[in-house]
Amino acid sequence: MPRPGKSSYSDQKPPYSYISLTAMAIQHSAEKMLPLSDIYKFIMERFPYYREHTQRWQNSLRHNLSFNDCFIKIPRRPDQPGKGSFWALHPDCGDMFENGSFLRRRKRFKVLRADHAHLHSGSSKGAPGTGPGGHLHPHHPHHAHHHHHHHHHAAHHHHHHHPPQPPPPPPPHMVPYFHQQPAPAPQPPHLPSQPAQQPQPQSQPPQTSHPGKMQEAAAVAAAAAAAAAAAVGSVGRLSQFPPYGLGSAAAAAAAAAASTTGFKHPFAIENIIGRDYKGVLQAGGLPLASVMHHLGYPVPGQLSNVVGSVWPHVGVMDSVAAAAAAAAAAGVPVGPEYGAFGVPVKALCHSANQSLPAVPVPIKPTPALPPVTTLPPALSVPTASQQLPAPSTVCAAAASPTAPLLEPTAAGRADSKGSSLHSVLVHS
């Protein structure tokens, strides 16, 4: 089909694709590149069909410019008037049309990613001034060689004038706790002619000047750490259980260190309890409070000595009579303001005008425990013929309000001789 002449163009749609129309407009320009507005202008002047419905075909033409590799976008130089970028043909798309005819396109031009990067790096086939490639990158081939030569020269210069620097010296050795390490001497500014190994001996601290002091400091620090670990682990724990997080060997070493150093934690129970209670606690073995008795759990006999030795403030008390007897047998002087357990008696008594008793007495009998065959004399259950001790032995002011409450309790105890003792807790 022969190429139609300009005089034969009519208002009918021309047989050219948008890619052919754009390539035709670019090749007819003097600089082989046109802005988008000039491409529109060329098409509308050449083909009257595109003078109508401009918005439709212009949108399609813009999409073809953006999504086809045969068109290259060139930024506008600052000295060029106008706005918008230029569009040019790819240097390698010359054979895209058969025999230079825009009627038929041989195949869609596709630029490989390696070739595209090679083109932008300066290895384009077009020479300066011979085509669009000359406008894009006129000096890239020489620039690549020059850059390589410059890089090689810089590396050669750095190799001759700047020897490779040694790795930075290690940080000064940190001696634990109180041993202060001398600060390293400041290094002079590095000069190219001076080797970098010279200021290193100055920066090394004199660690070998006092080997005896360092060993002694390390030994003292290790002993202090072991004592602290033993103290933290042993406070509030039984002696037969190792501290949390320490093995058997570590626990034994910590216990030995704690026993030899005599370290006492500031919050140890020996430092918290007042001096007035130490005589009662050490002599009679009677504690100030009984955690297990608070909870209502009986303490076995084989654990009473362990609990009394490890936890002086925790133990077992069963009755006021047993406590008073033990304190009297030990011959420990107890002040008039303290009871047998070291608890102020005045705190347990209330004024006579109060209606509630000072000592909480259970109204309903508690569930009976399994019968006990033998009980100590101090803990035997009183029979019906025996009289209960008057409440005035504990506090005279609390006798009258507690009398009507203790009578049904005594009757219930007399009926159930086989039940165990339900002692009343007389401390706070």
Curated annotation (Swiss-Prot):
It holds the Pfam family Forkhead. It is found in: Nucleus. Residues 136-163 have a biased composition (Basic residues). Residues 12-103 bind DNA. The keyword Transcription regulation applies. PANTHER family: FORKHEAD BOX PROTEIN, FORKHEAD BOX PROTEIN B2. This is Forkhead box protein B2. The lineage of its organism: Eukaryota, Metazoa, Chordata, Craniata, Vertebrata.
